[in-house]
Amino acid sequence: MKVVASVVLVLGLISFFCNKKLNDAYFLRIIHESKEYLKSVQMYNTYRFDEKGKPKYIEAISNNSGEENFLVIIGESQNRKHMSAYGYSRDTTPWLAVQRTKENFVIMKNGYACNTLTMLALSQALTEKSQYNHKTLDKSYSLIDIAKAAGFKTYWISNQAQYGSYNTPITLIANSADEKIWLNSDSSASSSYDEKILPALSMVKGKGKKVIFIHLYGNHWEYNNRYPQEKYGIFDNSNYNGKVVDLKKLNAYDNSMYYNDCITEKIFQYAKQNWHVSNIVYFSDHGESVLNDNKHIPGKYDDDMGTVPVYFYFSDEYIKAHPDIVKRTKNNEGVYFTNDMMYNALIDLWGIKTPHYDVKENFLSDEYGYGAGKLLILDKIKI
C-alpha cells in the first residue's frame, strides 16, 4: 500500500513538474521507471543486512595513519552563477571569494548537478549509483557504508526535514550513520535557518577518526524564508541592473546566498578549531533557475538548474601527507563533471581502498574518463 501511494505521489509530482501534456507512451514509461525506483528504495536495506539484521561485510580499508576527520557540507538549490566567488556581480559570497585565493583551497569551475530534484540528485551523489554505471540504488553502497566499514565513526547533521523513516532515499542513507541529528521537523515553507546547525556541532566529540555530513537548507524556495531578514537582507532593487522575471525573488535568493556564505564560514571555523579536520568538501545537490523563475522544475530545465558550486579545503597536515591528491585536485579544477561522481572523489580524498570504487568516475583522478560532451543531467540532457 505504501509503494502504491508513493508511486501515485511521484507520478503526481512528475506531472506537475513537467509543464507539458504527457502522451500515453511517455506516461507508461514514467509509471515503469517510478515503480522500479521505488522498488529499489524499498529493497535498500535488504542489500545491507543479513537475515538476522546484522550489517553485511563490506571490503573497505583506510590507508590513513592517525586520527583524520573529514567533513562534507551539502548545499541546497545553490546556483554558482549567483556567487561572487564565481564572478557574480553582487557580492554574495565575500568569505568564499577570499578563500579561493588561498593555497589550501580549491574551487571547481565546472561542476554540474546530476538531477534537479534533491531526492534523485543525492541518492546518486552519496552512493555508487550514477547516471553512467546503471546501478540500482538497492545494489549500491553509500559513502556512509564505506566510511563505517573503513573504521570511521559517521555523523549526519541535517536542517532538512526527515519526513518518515522510509519515505525518501536520503533518509535511508542518513539513517545508516552512527549518529543522526535532525534539526527541522517542519515543511519547506518554514523559516528553519541554517544557524540551527551551529550549536549542534558540539555534539560531535570524542577520539577516533570521523566523517561528518552536514545537510543545509541552503537556498531552497521560498528564498525569503532562508535567512533572518533584518541582518542579511542586504540586496534590494537599487543594486541590480540585469534582466529578471521577478526582482523581489532574485533579491531574496541573493540574500539567502549571502547568509549561506556567513553560515558556511562559521562551520568551517568550528570544524578546523574543534575537530581539526583534514579535509572539507562542499557541494550543492542542484542549482536554481532564479532569473527565469523556473526554480528547479525538470520539465522547464535550463542551465541554471545544473550549475552548482563544489570546493575543497585541505589542512596543512593533509597537504603534507597527501601531496599527490592535492596536486591532482588543483590540476583538475577546470574539468567538467556531475555531482553523482562525488562518491568516488570522496573515497579517494579519504584514502579508502575498496572494490566499490570507480576511478573513471573520480573527477579528481588522472584516469578520469569523462568531461564536456560525455556528461548528462536528468539521465538524458548532455552537458
Spell out what each predicted region is:
Residues L71, Y259-P298, Y343:
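Metal-dependent active-site segment of extracytoplasmic phospho-/sulfohydrolases and closely related
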